[in-house]
């Protein structure tokens, strides 16, 4: 049923074995996200751009990216080396791990190849690094909490078999330091 002055829409044929049932992905994304003249993206028709972005999604500087990549590479190499030391790999696994270590440490290997290799070996290695970091932080917090010196209450002091009494200030210690004599051992 076409409106007057407009041509009728074409209907898609019934989906066959090789035809997708939903619209083309490109046309779907065009309808979901439109660009304004100044280049800011507008989603769902609202004309406002988000004022604050998530700090994790903010682009990092070149130095920060290089530092993060170095940490990721070091983590992956460390995991591979630990796997070689702690497990009993087959010769094929050992050769594969050594080749991966060599590739990750190489200065000639391009960065996309290193990232691809890390993802193929470890899956989502960034999430694993983050989880490991959180576990280490939690362990440090619990260790710091258990290491704190807590004052002993009055009830605990009363239970103790040791009697703690303040010394009178007039008495001196068992060894007297008042003599000015030179110290000598009495071996003879």
From Swiss-Prot:
Keyword list, A-Z: Acetylation, Phosphoprotein
Transmembrane helix recorded as keyword: no
Positions bearing Phosphoserine: 41
Residue spans of biased composition, Basic and acidic residues class: 166-182
Transcription is among the record's keywords: no
Modified residues (N-acetylalanine): 2
Renumbered residue ranges of the record's region Disordered: 1-65, 87-112, 144-182
Family according to the record: Belongs to the UPF0488 family.
Protein name: UPF0488 protein C8orf33 homolog
């Amino acid at each position: 049923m076409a409106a007057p002055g407009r041509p009728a829409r074409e209907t898609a044929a019934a989906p066959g074995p090789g035809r997708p049932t939903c619209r083309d992905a490109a046309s779907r994304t065009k309808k979901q996200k439109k660009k304004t003249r100044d280049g800011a993206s507008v989603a769902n028709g609202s004309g406002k751009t988000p004022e604050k972005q998530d700090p994790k999604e903010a682009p990092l500087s070149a130095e920060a990216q290089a530092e993060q990549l170095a940490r990721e590479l070091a983590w992956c190499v460390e995991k591979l080396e630990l796997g070689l030391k702690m497990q009993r790999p087959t010769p094929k696994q050992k050769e594969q791990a050594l080749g991966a270590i060599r590739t990750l440490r190489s200065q000639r290997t391009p960065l996309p190849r290193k990232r691809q290799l890390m993802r193929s070996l470890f899956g989502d290695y960034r999430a694993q690094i983050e989880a490991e970091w959180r576990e280490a932080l939690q362990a440090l917090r619990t260790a710091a909490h258990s290491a704190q010196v807590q004052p002993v209450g009055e009830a605990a002091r009363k239970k103790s078999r040791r009697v703690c009494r303040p010394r009178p200030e007039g008495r001196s210690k068992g060894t007297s330091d008042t003599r000015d004599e030179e110290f000598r051992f009495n071996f003879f």
